[in-house]
Design a protein with these regions (language model features):
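Short, intrinsically disordered terminal tails adjacent to the first/last structured region
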Residues: 2, 8-31, 247-257
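Membrane-interface loops
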Residues: 63-77, 107-191, 195, 243-257
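C-terminal membrane module of polytopic membrane proteins
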Residues: 218, 224-257
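Interfacial helix-loop-helix junctions of multi-pass membrane proteins
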Residues: 146, 165-168, 206-232
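Active-site His/Glu-centered metal-binding helix of metallohydrolases
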Residues: 93, 175, 219, 223
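Aromatic-anchored segments of alpha-helical transmembrane domains
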Residues: 56-58, 125-131, 202-212
Length: 257
């Protein structure tokens, strides 16, 4: 409530009120600025989020080329795999799965584990963008009609409307699912829990199968995604290549000292 002196003019009252609002607004901005600075100071590794400004514009640009000619990805196995709409559940869980592992490592994991996960993800995703740019690809596997009508087929229809059948090689759903499971399995807390590790494995396999049973990917896309993930796993976790230079630099500094 605004209290005022009867002797004051309305304009003076309004000016004082506006001044209070301005000071309050500046205080809020200052507090928000302090909170942001504190956040980035505590989580210095948050700079990796900038990758979104590379990936998303590039990906949406590729999706905008869906009407251009592309190489059709197809193998004989694709024709033998039936359409099963129930796989929409694990397929959609992929988004939460990959994000949940990311957030866990960001807030609770070691920086090394977080960087390993990001290197795994971002390297494969960048290669996917490059391949899709120089080798436009897609498939013709989607059914034109569904034998059944239920909530799952409705969800699949919505998925088909939102996602074009292009830019599919290698499968990022497959690649990122494997990356998430490997990161979770290597986490000293989550990886020691058999229930969590086992559930993660089942979800990973379900997502991989979903890409084919929903006719979102050819078996060739899946094979390429698995191969790329296997190579990245060897590079990131087996040889620890991503941090070998860091160890060498640290050893050199200790030698100099």
């Amino acid at each position: 409530m605004l209290y005022c002196d009867p002797d004051q003019k309305p304009t003076e009252i309004m000016m004082k009120h506006e001044m209070k609002l301005l000071l309050s607004h500046r205080y809020c901005i200052k507090k928000e600025d302090e909170i942001m600075k504190a956040f980035f100071h505590k989580y210095k590794h948050s700079f990796v989020l900038l990758y979104a400004f590379i990936y998303l514009p590039w990906f949406f640009w590729l999706e905008s080329r869906a009407n251009l000619p592309y190489h059709v990805i197809h193998v004989g196995l694709d024709d033998k795999i039936p359409f099963v709409e129930y796989f929409i559940v694990p397929y959609l869980l992929w988004f939460a799965y990959v994000a949940a592992v990311f957030l866990w490592l960001f807030f609770r994991g070691t920086k090394k584990a977080f960087y390993q996960y990001c290197i795994f993800l971002f390297t494969g995703m960048t290669l996917f963008l490059i391949i899709s740019t120089v080798f436009p690809n897609g498939h013709l596997l989607r059914p034109t009609s569904f034998e059944r009508h239920n909530i799952f087929t409705v969800a699949v229809q919505l998925l088909y409307q939102a996602d074009t059948p292009t830019n599919i090689f290698p499968s990022i759903h497959v690649f990122n699912s494997i990356a998430a499971h490997r990161a979770l399995s290597n986490d000293p807390k989550l990886g020691q829990n058999r229930l969590i590790r086992g559930g993660s494995f089942v979800l990973m396999v379900s997502i991989i199968l979903a890409t084919m049973f929903l006719k979102q990917h050819s078996a060739l896309d899946v094979a390429a995604g698995i191969l790329l993930a296997t190579l990245m796993d060897q590079l990131v976790y087996r040889t620890d290549f991503a941090f070998s230079r860091e160890r060498v630099s640290k050893r050199n500094r200790e030698t100099v000292i």
